[in-house]
Amino acid sequence: MGIRISHLRKQFASFTALDDITLDVRQGELLALLGPSGSGKTTLLRIMAGLEHADGGQVLFGDEDATRMSVQSRRVGFVFQHYALFKHMDVFENIAFGLRVRRGKERWAEARIRARVEELLALVQLQGLEQRYPTQLSGGQRQRVALARALAIEPRVLLLDEPFGALDAQVRRDLRRWLRELHEQTGLTTVFVTHDQEEALELADRVAILNRGRIEQLDTPARVYDTPASPFVYSFVGAVNRIPGVLAHGQIQVAGHALPSANPALAAGPVEVYVRPEDLVPDADGWPATVAWAQRSGARLRVRAILDAAGNEVEVELPASAGTITAGQQLRLAARHYGVFPA
């Protein structure tokens, strides 16, 4: 089932959390809401879940208007950053909780509940741990229990609020791969919030970049990284160098060299060229630069250099096979891919 968000607005006193947000989440896709603190990503997720209500706009689940629908009626699975597991219940009962609290015709028979929990234990790879309590589990295992509990009610949509935020780096990486595989198995429409760029780019089918209550870009991970729609997206997703220039007659004068404009709609005048460290490469016809600092980092060589003509400091990332580079060494650098925006 898809989700359609239309002209959503949310205000907290004088703070605008969401400013006319419109967004379609496709059926079966895994969508990341990525942005800094205060960008509105968690507020948007909570409104989807029914935990907050918008001041204006509409939320549709499929063709059904869910804007004022209760949390229970929406049938969403929600996973919190800090698990929210019941400490006095073992793994089995935590997973079964949402099924046991149902009333009337919606209440399942005990045999069906048990079968569903056992199915989920296998799905999240926790067979044999059903009698353990949350305090006896690792952080990664607790998050799997939380996810199984969210899936137990057979939700129409799965929503995750920074699901790996409380875990250490290696566990996060392992769980990211596992969650992607799980999504492929279930095909459930899933939206997750994160401030971790790597997490969003690795996991999601599409990424919505939020900033100050607005969506700056909604696109595939590859296009978000390779073709950012704004200076904010360039700066927030990955590292970037900003080099001042002047656009005139379709050419950008940058550090004594001319570059073709990458944006034909851009008006003449001062501009900034945005280029990622890995897109600055040695080139005999490039900008003269002086190395200020160089450091090997695994398979990469990180270099900080000064463009001689402009005096701008830039960061360069080269393969370690580029050889030894030392401070004071002269280089020539060219931008193989870049974006241009008004200064």
From Swiss-Prot:
Entry-linked PANTHER family: SPERMIDINE/PUTRESCINE IMPORT ATP-BINDING PROTEIN POTA (PTHR42781), SPERMIDINE_PUTRESCINE IMPORT ATP-BINDING PROTEIN POTA (PTHR42781:SF4)
BP GO terms, sorted: sulfate transmembrane transport
Name of the protein: Sulfate/thiosulfate import ATP-binding protein CysA
Protein species of origin: Xanthomonas campestris pv. campestris (strain ATCC 33913 / DSM 3586 / NCPPB 528 / LMG 568 / P 25)
InterPro entries per UniProt: AAA+_ATPase, ABC_SmlMolc_Importer, ABC_transporter-like_ATP-bd, ABC_transporter-like_CS, Mo/tungstate-bd_C_term_dom, P-loop_NTPase, Sulph_transpt1, TOBE-like
EC main group: translocase
Similarity comment: Belongs to the ABC transporter superfamily. Sulfate/tungstate importer (TC 3.A.1.6) family.
Protein task: Part of the ABC transporter complex CysAWTP involved in sulfate/thiosulfate import. Responsible for energy coupling to the transport system.
